[in-house]
Amino acid sequence: GEEERKAMAELEAKKAQEALKA
């Protein structure tokens, strides 16, 4: 659903940020 997709996007963004920081 929408909430699920939103959570997925948040997780992906978090992962991307971590990769950039590392």
Curated annotation (Swiss-Prot):
Organism: Conus ochroleucus
Residues making up the signal peptide according to the UniProt record: none
Name assigned to this protein: Conantokin-Oc
Expression by tissue: Expressed by the venom duct.
Chain segments carrying region Disordered: 1-22
Function: Conantokins inhibit N-methyl-D-aspartate (NMDA) receptors.
Keywords: Gamma-carboxyglutamic acid, Ion channel impairing toxin, Ionotropic glutamate receptor inhibitor, Neurotoxin, Postsynaptic neurotoxin, Secreted, Toxin
Positions bearing 4-carboxyglutamate: E3, E4, E10, E18
Main location: secreted
Additional free-text comment from the UniProt record: The mature peptide does not contain cysteine residue.
